[in-house]
């Protein structure tokens, strides 16, 4: 599948039962702020995001995280064909280290962690599919 510039509704987890079926599984990997889960489906790759107010109180921050995650997934969607991927924020960001709710350091931190998790998830998907990851 060729990665396109669009991120259609079909590429997202939307319903509660879709999220629940992925959440029931053990998390694959963690970073300081995020956890990633995956579930084989045999269909096109889909992304679910759980960015709660408990860990990102300001809407600006939640929207920034979601935008970065969607873009990172959209550009690598072909690597996750046949899988539902769920990304969850599980820790607060240090307010003292981040000058504002949508600062460049916060965006860089989130983008780096999301990229790292997607790299690990792509390797896990490739391992479970019995193929070599595209990055090797």
UniProtKB/Swiss-Prot annotation:
Under InterPro entries, the record lists: Ribosomal_Su5_D2-typ_SF (IPR020568), Ribsml_uS5_D2-typ_fold_subgr (IPR014721), RNase_P (IPR000100), RNase_P_CS (IPR020539)
One Gene Ontology MF term: tRNA binding
Question: Could you tell me the superkingdom of the organism this chain comes from?
Answer: Bacteria
Give Gene Ontology CC terms. ribonuclease P complex
Kindly indicate whether the keyword Cytoplasm belongs to this entry. no
Chemical reaction(s) catalysed:
Endonucleolytic cleavage of RNA, removing 5'-extranucleotides from tRNA precursor
Q: Does the keyword Nucleotide-binding apply?
A: no
PROSITE patterns associated with the record? RIBONUCLEASE_P
Summary of the function given for this chain in its UniProt record: RNaseP catalyzes the removal of the 5'-leader sequence from pre-tRNA to produce the mature 5'-terminus. It can also cleave other RNA substrates such as 4.5S RNA. The protein component plays an auxiliary but essential role in vivo by binding to the 5'-leader sequence and broadening the substrate specificity of the ribozyme.
> What do we know about how this protein assembles, alone or with others?
Consists of a catalytic RNA component (M1 or rnpB) and a protein subunit.
Q: What is this protein called?
A: Ribonuclease P protein component
């Amino acid at each position: 599948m060729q990665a396109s510039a669009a991120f259609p509704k079909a590429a997202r987890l939307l319903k509660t039962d879709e999220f629940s079926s992925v959440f029931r599984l053990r998390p694959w990997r963690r970073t300081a702020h995020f956890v990633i889960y995956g579930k084989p489906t045999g269909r096109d790759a889909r992304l679910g995001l759980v960015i709660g107010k408990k860990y990102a109180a300001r809407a600006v921050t939640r929207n920034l995280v979601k935008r970065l995650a969607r873009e990172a997934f959209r550009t690598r969607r072909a690597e996750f064909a046949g899988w539902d991927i769920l990304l969850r924020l599980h820790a607060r960001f240090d307010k003292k280290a981040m000058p504002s709710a949508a600062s460049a350091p916060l965006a860089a931190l989130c983008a780096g962690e999301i990229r790292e998790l997607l790299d690990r998830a792509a390797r896990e998907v490739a391992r479970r599919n019995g193929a070599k990851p595209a990055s090797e």
